Amino acid sequence: DFKDEEFGINEMRNFVLKHEKSKLVFSVTFSYPANMTLETIVETIREKAKNMEVTCVQHYFPVKFEKDCPMVSLLSKAYEKITHLDGTPVTTTGGTYAKLMPHIVPFGPSFPGQKGIGHQPNEWMKIEDLNTNAKIYALGIYYLGML
């Protein structure tokens, strides 16, 4: 049971089970909180799956920025200026694109009532919210340009 107060719980998704060269291969994608290590997760899986070979094929470290770092503060400021809502940053175990390049803050504003709509089948967003996001991104880029 891996969890972190800020990031939430470890997520497992993209399950694939296939037969390969007389072996049954089970693949899964994990997104895990920054307070965990890959080694801890792999060891836990090995303990639970004693008769199976466990291999990490690809790994990206979790992304974590302090809430008061300049980039996060400016993006929060842009959110608050456009929405007039509390822009206190929250985090998840996602942010895949930010794991591929250093110094990229994963930023995707969400609005009240939108919990859990991202990365789901038939992902959706209201046109009004899409327009609000565009305004937030534009102002955020403007603010970041002042760093």
Kindly label every feature range from the protein language model.
Residues D1-R13, K18, N35, E53-L147:
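An extended, acidic, His-containing surface patch that forms the Zn2+-binding/catalytic region
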Residues E39-K50:
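Short amphipathic alpha-helices in soluble, non-transmembrane regions
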Residues K23-L38:
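C-terminal catalytic subdomain
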